[in-house]
Regions:
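Conserved donor-binding/catalytic core segment of Leloir-type glycosyltransferases
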Residues: 159-176, 218
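Active-site donor-binding acidic/aromatic loop of nucleotide-activated sugar
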Residues: 199-205, 296-300
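Catalytic binding pocket for nucleotide-activated donors in carbohydrate/polymer assembly enzymes
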Residues: 3-16, 20-42, 91, 111-112, ...
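Surface-exposed cleft-lining segments at the edges of enzyme active sites
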Residues: 66, 170-175, 198-203, 311-321
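A conserved nucleotide-sugar
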Residues: 185-199, 249, 274, 293
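Acidic anion/phosphate-binding donor-loop and adjacent secondary structure
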Residues: 147-161, 210-211
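Extended catalytic core of nucleotide-activated donor transferases of GT-like folds
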Residues: 2-136, 146-154
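A conserved mid-protein helix/loop that constitutes part of the nucleotide-sugar donor-binding site
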Residues: 20, 175-187
Length: 407
């Protein structure tokens, strides 16, 4: 079989337009010249029968991150179909952290049950192999995110950008045991920079892919850190304790909880993002008046220090390095937006003070960081160097090349 004849089925779940890398991976598979790819949205019920009829026709079946990142509800009807495949199965895994929304164990159990041939991890390879050690029939391969240069390119020259430092991220929940990103955003929002800088940092709103690209092109710089948590567990033991604690508190208050995958939550998934932004606040107030809490609000409101002291203080960190590079880092490089980032490993892809300006975790070198950031020559050299490096080795085309070579 020639590699150019790889018939590929790409399964994805389209119920959000906020995470741009979902579209970037899908586009990369669909446009790769060595694949004949068909993409199917598993959230559309009418596709189930078609996939069942044709599953034996594919050399490669790919489960993108979206099929298991937040729920297994949509992929569950495909479980028996995937077992009947003839081709190889590659399963990506979305959100490789322990969350009350969906357990890592349930994702691992699904992958084991369908006997995935390959597991594509966003984590460093050592961490991925540790996490999926029970999936003995699967090969764990490092497939971190990358750059889609068609979606994220340098449109506005750096000297013409109107925002000095801009950033977007949802607040990290306390149940991750990791407050680095929240602390980073809080520090930059409050620090008295001299000279003063124009900041646009927000943890309450997000962009779709095109909006995120436009925003980055307005920013000379952005701030970030590695994704994930130092407290990754295969059995979700700690987050289950936090979940039981949080639910017992709500019960004591006589409050009901809108839980994950309940009917109201399923309906909410399909509300357009712009409408969600409009109705979220009044809906939250209405639910509060009924003494009803949405599960995510409960975890957002948990105090980090109290949660850490109660649940994380006396447990060891993950035995392997479990934080990772994320799509946001590649998006910024694509738009030539200079990154100020906390020190970390970044999957050994990005090098400190070569591809980004490294900030110590206690922020003690902020003066030196800003001197480098405000030096226009240093700034331009860094973004150009990072851009050329990523374009040469770390686009989504390169990632799908690696998938093709597995066959």
């Amino acid at each position: 079989m020639r590699k150019s004849s790889l018939h590929t089925l790409v399964l994805y779940a389209r119920y959000t337009d906020k995470l741009s890398y979902y579209d970037d991976w899908q586009y990369a598979f669909e446009t790769h010249p060595d694949l004949c790819a068909r993409s199917v949205n598993i959230c559309d019920g009418k596709n189930l029968r078609s996939v069942k009829r044709s599953i034996g026709d594919y050399d490669l079946i790919v489960l993108l991150h979206s099929v298991n990142a937040d729920t297994l509800v949509f992929i569950e009807p495909y479980r028996s179909i995937l077992k009947d495949r003839k081709g190889k199965l590659l399963s990506f895994v979305g959100n490789e952290v322990n969350l009350p929304r969906i357990s890592m164990k349930s994702k691992i159990d699904f992958i084991k049950d369908v006997s995935a041939d390959f597991i594509g991890t966003q984590l460093p390879l050592e961490a991925g192999r540790w996490l999926y050690v029970e999936c003995r029939g699967s090969s764990v391969v490092a497939l971190p995110h990358a750059l889609n240069p068609k979606a994220f390119g340098p449109i506005i020259p750096n000297g013409e950008r109107t925002i000095d430092i801009g950033a977007r991220s949802h607040q990290y929940w306390s149940c991750l045991g990791d407050n680095e990103r929240n602390d980073l955003y809080g520090f930059f929002a409050k620090y008295p920079f001299i000279p003063s800088l124009k900041m646009d940092i927000d943890t309450k709103s997000r962009f779709d892919r095109s909006g995120w690209s436009v925003f980055l092109n307005q920013c000379r710089g952005t701030i970030s850190n590695e994704a994930g948590s130092y407290y990754l567990e295969r059995d979700d033991a700690t987050v289950r304790k936090i979940q039981a604690f949080a639910e017992s508190q709500q019960k004591e208050k006589g409050s009901k909880i809108v839980k994950p995958d309940s009917l109201p939550e399923r309906l909410w998934r399909f509300v357009p993002s712009q409408l969600k932004e409009v109705v979220k606040a009044p809906l939250s107030r209405f639910l509060k008046s009924l003494n009803v809490s949405y599960y995510s609000d409960i975890y957002e409101q948990l105090d980090f220090n109290e949660t850490f002291e109660r649940f994380f203080k006396d447990i060891p960190r993950c035995p392997v390095y479990s934080k990772a590079i994320s799509s946001r880092h590649f998006d910024a490089i694509g738009t030539k937006t200079c990154q100020i980032m906390l020190e970390g490993r970044y999957n050994e892809i990005l090098k400190a003070d070569e591809h980004f300006i490294a900030l110590k975790h206690d922020f003690s070198n902020i003066t030196e960081v800003m001197i480098r950031f405000l030096d226009s020559t240093c700034h331009q050299v860094m973004v150009d160097r990072a851009y050329e490096y990523i374009m040469d080795q770390h686009t989504y085309r390169h990632r799908v090349d690696a998938v093709r070579d597995l066959m």
